[in-house]
Amino acid sequence: MERIVECVPNISEGRRKDVIEAVVNEVRSTPNVMLLDYSSDESHNRSVITFMGEPEAVVDAAVKLAKKAAELIDLTKHTGEHPRMGAVDVIPLIPIRGITKEETVELSKKLGERVCIEADIPVFLYEDSASAPNRTNLAAIRKGQFEGMAEKVQQDEWAPDFGGRRIHPTAGVVAVGCRMPLVAFNINLSTSDVSVASKIAKIIRRSSGGLDCVKALGIMLEDRNIAQVSINMTDFSRTPLYRVLEFVRFEAARYGVQVIGTEIIGLTPMRALVDCAEYYLQIENFNADKQVLENYIQ
C-alpha cells in the first residue's frame, strides 16, 4: 500500500509575497511531494502551507522549508496578531494512508532532529509526539512567544527536545509532531472590539471549560477593522463546525454583535462540511457515503 503523510507548516510571514513564494518553492522543488494549498493572512502575518507525499520526501521538503524560513524571516522585526515563537512556527505531520500514528510519531522525531541540525532551530516535540504531558498542547509551548522564549527554555520543564537551552536569534524555536487532522475555522464578528472576540474565545475553548476539542483566541483584523474568533478544532467528529458556529453566534448576541462571515484555512476533511450541510438543510435519513456523488468517483 502507498504510504502518504500530510504536512501543514505554519510560517510567520503573511505580508511579503516574495518571501512566501521562496519558502513555498522549497516544497515545489522536492521530488515525490505534492503541494496542495497555501494561504496567507496579513493581519495574522502568517501563512499556512499544505503538502503531502511519501514519508521521507515529506521530511526532506519540511527541512528545506524550515531552512529557507530561518534564512528569510527575522522575528526580531515581526509583528502580527497571531501568537508565534518561530520563523517556521509549527510543523505537524498527519498520517493519511498506509502509515500508522505510531510510525508518524517516529517520523516526526526524525524530522525534528534534522530541522535542529540542518536549520539550526531548537525543536519542541508536541501533540502525539510530546516527550512530556505539558508539551502536548501547542499553546502551552508557545506561551511567552518569541520574545520570552530565550528565558523560558532555561527552565527544566521547557528545555527543547532538540537543540539545547537556546533559541535561534532570529528564527526562534519550532514545534514538530504528529497529530490527527484538524479544522482551522475562523469566525468574523461585526465589531472592532477585540475584547468581545477574546471573551467568546474563552467561553468556547476546552481549556476554559468550553467545547470539547476546541482551541480558540480572539484577535483583531486590522486591515478589515473587525474582531475575529480564531479556532482550531482538533476532532470535528466530537464537536462539529455547526455547533461551534451556533455557540459563537449565541454568545455574540449577548454583546449586540453578529457573525458576519467565516473562514476555513487550508484544507479540511469533506466529512466536516457534509456534516454542516446535513445539519442546516435538515436532511432526513442522510447517508453521505451513498448520497454524495464524489464518493463514487474517488
Tell where the protein language model's regions lie, with residue ranges.
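Long, contiguous binding/interaction regions
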Residues: 1-298
